[in-house]
């Protein structure tokens, strides 16, 4: 034993909001000795450490500190310090406070929802100073932090053997006992993967909401009936955390005895990671339409006043048609399942493109398995996704894997019917229809993009390729007879 580490703790944690508290308790419950620190801001954050140590952490191997130097000194070398603070400048400020007290080889772990580009920069900065930095995406919310989350670490690879025992011990375990925490890759890859996870989460939630909305407005099902349908779906291929909680929500009553879901205002908030996933997909030149739709629908939902005004100007006239409820529920199932597969396929395609662009060498099968427990998008078909990516002949696209190709063929008829009927009844299903249009575009050998490129060449001399020439040769047409032969350089519209 290193005598310098005698009576030292195994890990330090900074930031005692609920996520930080729960992670510290989780670590202590797994046998680790933990030092905790929280800033003191007069009139804003006072007595945070004392309340935690004497409250929820009482009797556990958790030591509290209000002095950052004493906190750092209390941790065994090489120090492992997990930061659970608000993403952005707060992380940078905290790092600057820590640097003077660290020793060479110490490890900082950012467990917040940081932008992966910030993590890229922080890894480089820490390593330049002789330290190590891990950007670890943590999914699972308050419950996951306490009982086991999905943790996605990336950054300084030499830090992994040091932090692996602790992080894997507090991570959720999949049904086969595998920890939902594996090394992702270098730089900001861990936070990038968490960002795409959150984007898929946005898509999942929008799709489930649309399924609920069609049941309610097209079929006229009551809350109990809808809850039963979601509960039944959770016993099959749609089994997942989000379907599970959706089965509970319609039946939940408030203190007055009424159904709470019917009293919740139809405006959905967002914190930004869904938007980040869409922006980064665009920068990588990858379609992420379903998730973009989910993000934009939250934005539109927030414009409640505008929607109320518009609803009085354009009255939706729904027919009095009586639908075969059992058959229509099957169609809703098909639309939900198929669209979810599209959402995951789009997300994993972005991960693959990022892996290639940034030389991260991401293991998509490992990522799929990592999401099987603890995280918000955990679902049974992630096993099938992992299997597809582990195949000897790895598919170019998830939906082209034999298993998913067969699933999509079985689901397509009901999916099409559901979207068509919803449009006929003037019932918005933007994510279902976005997914269906993406699928049709994906399986189309030809698209109308030739017209777009002709237009670009007409007004901007952006050139085009020809179907009767080899790929890679570019041509410009003098469309008007007086435009000249000069081609566009780097100018793009």
Predicted feature descriptions by range:
Residues 2-66, 70-73, 79, 101-105, ...:
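NAD(P)+-binding Rossmann beta1-loop-alpha1 motif at the extreme N-terminus of oxidoreductases
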Residues 11, 91-95, 109, 115-227, ...:
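Rossmann-fold dinucleotide-binding core
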Residues 232, 355-388:
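Small-residue-rich helix-loop
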Residues 409, 417-493:
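C-terminal amphipathic alpha-helical interaction region
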